[in-house]
Regions:
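Short low-complexity stretches enriched in small and charged residues
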Residues: 1, 29-31, 71
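N-terminal presequence-like segments and adjacent domain-start helices
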Residues: 1-11
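Short beta-strand-to-loop capping motifs
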Residues: 42-46
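Polar/charged, Gly/Pro-rich intrinsically disordered segments
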Residues: 74-109
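Residues at or immediately flanking beta-strands
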Residues: 39, 72-74
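Short edge beta-strands and adjacent turn/loop segments
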Residues: 21-39
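Short, non-transmembrane amphipathic alpha-helical segments
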Residues: 15-18, 48-72
Length: 109
């Protein structure tokens, strides 16, 4: 699998996983990979409820389900209240970013 294939799979499966799963408090989701490990990072605004954590874990599972064995998943679910800089500790692939006045100029690609 080429890097382009991996990137495309991550983006497609993350988008599918996010359908009907984005709470208002989710500020961003970024992804990346290292070897055969997919890394996902969810950034929330305010307290993170157990329901929010479960939704994030389901999205992560949807992402890694698009890859054959031996691919694995690492998840990071963090609180970074607005207007904290979303670029700090972001992974390279931006899958979702909530509209905020501070999101202008983010590397969305």
């Amino acid at each position: 699998m080429t890097d382009a294939d991996i990137r495309l799979n991550i983006l497609i499966f993350a988008q599918r996983g996010l359908l009907f799963a984005v709470p208002p408090s989710l500020r961003a989701m970024t992804c990346g990979w290292s070897g055969t490990t997919v890394n996902v990072r969810f950034v929330f605004d305010g307290p993170i409820s157990e329901d929010d954590k479960e939704s994030a874990r389901i999205v992560g599972t949807e992402v890694v389900a698009g890859f054959p064995s031996p691919w694995t998943l690492t998840e990071e679910i963090v609180r970074l209240d607005y207007p904290g800089d979303l670029r700090s500790d972001a992974l390279p692939l931006w899958v979702y970013a909530r509209k905020e006045t501070t999101t202008e100029g983010l590397p969305i690609y």
